[in-house]
Amino acid sequence: MLPDALPRQLERAPQQVPFLPKEQPEFRLRGGWKGTAELLRADFEEKIQVVHKKDLKNRADYARITTLYTGLVLRARQPGDRFRPAGRGLSKPLRKWMNEAGVPNELRDTLPLLASGSEILWVCGEGFADGLAPDTESRWILHLDAEIETQEEKTNEYAR
């Protein structure tokens, strides 16, 4: 009975969830995605450090996001969505960006996104949109991450 009940339970995962990192740091979305939203205190030091771009792509200035955007939700793509990839300075349809970025077809309809209306602020695996990176003025940094649960994780979660 467990294997049959588990997929039905996961299909009932919401299509979108309100973005509330302080109250609800973990989220689940359809397609078996499980993620975390973490607020980190920004402690920039005066010394120079070598930082890899991949270490920063899932981090953004939390105050900038909450000041500029309202109605934040975590969800999958919808018609009319637009994304401004970091460093490119232009906005393009999310559908076109996914084609250019080589996002596998089977992930496109379930890939977690942080959105404000049709503007996409974060794409799982790509990072935050242009202009949201933390800087020396940032006090709080938002770190977002998500992955598809393994069957073992799903079974363990169900058994709890």
Regions found by a protein language model. Give the residues of each.
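AMP-forming adenylation/ATP pyrophosphatase catalytic core
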Residues: 1-160
